[in-house]
Amino acid sequence: MSLSGIITALVTPFDRDGAFDRDAWIRLLDMQLAGGVQGVVIAGSTGEAATLTDAEYDEMLCSAVVRVGGRVPVLAGTGLSGTAKTISQTKRAADNGAGYALVVTPPYIRPNQGGLKAHYLAVAEQGGLPVVLYNVPSRTGCDLLPETVADLAGHPNIVGIKEACASRERVQALLALRRPGFAVFSGDDSSAARSMLDGADGLVSVASNVLPSAYRHLCDLARAGERGAIDLWNARLSDFHAFCGLDSNPIPIKALLQRIGIGYGLRLPLLPLSVCHHDIADHLADQVAALEALSSRKIVTA
């Protein structure tokens, strides 16, 4: 199953006591599928993977694979600070039924480009899953440069990249080096339409947790080259783009989800959305149903 279009980086819903909320998880998955998403990421940074136990990781992934039932690709976040641990986590994801591993650059370690290349080649060769590279320097402290991606993209088990840098030049550099079978995804909601108009294959989105149909529509417009319609639709979503940047991800998006009845909070060291932002959260939550209803009538088959 190939990767393209809108993929949601799912949150992990917790209950009032901070435990994994399986019922809310299933409802979130169902909402994504009904909204037309073309893939889901389990236990990535948006999913607070660093706070999950092994048992929770297994339960989330297994239940998602069963619920999705092969309708869309399931990507598992498996990137950890060490290469051996990342390989082990990737094997764990494979055992739980994931179709792909989304592997972030090793956080905190700050390897050089040679180290990053060796790391990803080891995971691709030993992890047991097709690998999607994930570059998010603002979180990890290291930057996977396009020339390193060019070297890695030739490996048959490295099938794409999620690039969270919003720089147009960065995305264009990645597009210039890609080969058939290697997908380039934006990891930035606000600039994704522009990236897709330039040739990117899709978006791995945070805001689509609450607006799956709306972001599917955005991606459909971009893939169809509808520049005028994209500008209008992006304007409708601009407040959501801005809101998701008010605090560390996934604090804002989980505040919106809580307001529509999915989950109750985060795990330390993350704290709930500041009270000073509650009014805007309430305002945006009130818009969700109308935006989803409007965009669900506009989804086209890709």
From Swiss-Prot:
The record marks 45, 108 as: Part of a proton relay during catalysis. Pyruvate binds at residues 46, 204. It is found in: Cytoplasm. Its EC number is 4.3.3.7. Belongs to the DapA family. Catalyzes the condensation of (S)-aspartate-beta-semialdehyde [(S)-ASA] and pyruvate to 4-hydroxy-tetrahydrodipicolinate (HTPA). This is 4-hydroxy-tetrahydrodipicolinate synthase.
